[in-house]
Amino acid sequence: MKVMMALLQKEWLEGWKSGKLIWLPIAMMIVGLTQPLTIYYMPEIIAHGGNLPDGMKISFTMPSGSEVMVSTLSQFNTLGMALVIFSVMGSVANERNQGVTALIMSRPVTAAHYIVSKWLIQSVIGIMSFAAGYGLAYYYVRLLFEDASFSRFAASLGLYALWVIFIVTAGLAGSTIFRSVGAAAACGIGLTAAVSFAVSLFPDGAKWLPAEICKQAEHILLHGERADFFGWSLTFSILCIMLLAVFSVWRFRRYESY
């Protein structure tokens, strides 16, 4: 237990030293802020964009607060996903290249201790950053649009946090596979993008994939209730996260040298 606590403290301090605990929440807040403001001011943006015939009027139906929140989640599913992957991609690869891993593993530290400590702290940072951005989006939606349900917001936040954990786990797995930071990022982004595309292309046959959690969160925002296969989606998402985490530990143990 002492070993795990020491590693957790190390990872948390590393988050401060690298600036990750500062730039990631700020970046997520910018992502969350952009969508509500863009939608709200879209008529003015189009009107002042020029190249419109004289006398032409633009008809723009203002979406509901829930629809804006769904649009914001879609934004997090692209830019947010990349930001989380970039924050995780060097977790193992950088320390191996700098010789830090060899120093840590020369002490009574197991592969499980090493990987799990990184997974826990990176997940906490990712969820905190997403919550900051999503919470800011909710604030502006309530300010600029119709009142959005807080219970729906909280439920969608909790569900999407599980997707953030999956993204973190995928990025960490990529960092254990490749020593190159770029290759690790490509692996993490490729895996999460493939899962998302599969759910979009095969909506009926891919309900068990973790990206279905995003659809569940959107359904709750719009309808205030769970969609079909909610239990299966939740169960298999947790299972996929566990399998990826176990794979990362297994891959780390197979290193011939750190």
Swiss-Prot record:
UniProt keyword annotations, A-Z: Cell membrane, Membrane, Transmembrane, Transmembrane helix
| Cellular location(s) | Cell membrane
| Positions of transmembrane segments | 21-41, 73-93, 119-139, 153-173, 182-202, 229-249
Its Gene Ontology cellular component terms are:
plasma membrane
- Its induction, per UniProt? Expression is sigma Y-dependent. Induced upon nitrogen starvation.
Annotated membrane topology is: Multi-pass membrane protein
Q: Give one GO molecular function term.
A: ABC-type transporter activity
Chief place where the protein resides: membrane
Which protein are we looking at?
Uncharacterized transmembrane protein YxlG
Q: What is the lineage of its organism?
A: Bacteria, Bacillati, Bacillota, Bacilli, Bacillales
What would be the name of the gene that encodes this protein? Answer: yxlG
